[in-house]
Design a protein with these regions (language model features):
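Extracellular/periplasmic carbohydrate-active domains that bind, remodel
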Residues: 1-181
Length: 181
């Protein structure tokens, strides 16, 4: 809780930032390149042994991408590496879920750039809720698979008897997308 990530550069083949069951988080002015995994991912897993939301999170002025590993840091911005072994496309996106037992509340993503990666994903499949989500002023360039992906499902990695999740009050506005597959 009470986490600030500001002006960081991460270039990896794993999740860049993996925020789980946290509140009062600010991620700003970060550049995250992750061709084989998610750049910035919010989760609300059941790892603590109880339900806990991820809430009051602001992600702003960030750049996420799926260029070759290491090429962002060295400035070459290459796209020569084979795709991720488990799928034929680059990842490098901002994502809420899929680990979603507790849920997500009061999340803002604004003024971010997605480049050569998958788009924005909002997913709740483990019984959690997604509510009061504000996505605005996003630029997407060379996006593969889906520019915006919403998923409400029932994978249910929560304790038995947990009801299905829900999505409420999600606002997505001012999206500029170029070259989206």
């Amino acid at each position: 809780d009470n986490l600030t990530l500001d002006n960081l550069k991460v270039d990896t083949n794993r999740d860049g930032f993996d925020i789980d069951c946290c509140k009062n988080v600010r991620i700003s002015r970060c550049s995250v390149n992750t061709p084989w995994d998610d750049a910035i991912v919010l989760k609300s897993s059941y790892a603590l042994g109880y339900f806990k939301d991820t809430e009051n999170v602001t992600i702003s002025d960030c750049f996420v991408s799926g260029y070759d590993r290491g090429s962002m840091l060295c400035g070459t911005w290459e796209l020569d590496e084979p795709q991720a072994p488990d799928h034929g496309y680059r990842t490098g996106r901002i994502k809420l879920g899929t680990e979603s037992s507790g849920g997500f509340k009061n999340i803002t993503v604004t003024n971010c750039i997605f480049e050569h990666c998958r788009g924005l994903a909002l997913e709740t499949v483990d019984g959690g809720h997604l509510e009061d989500i504000e996505i605005s002023h996003i630029t997407m360039r060379h996006i593969v698979n889906a520019g915006i992906f919403l998923r409400l499902g029932a994978r249910m990695r929560s304790p038995e008897g947990t009801p299905a999740g829900s999505m409420k009050r999600i606002r997505i506005s001012h999206i500029n997308a170029y070259d989206v597959d």
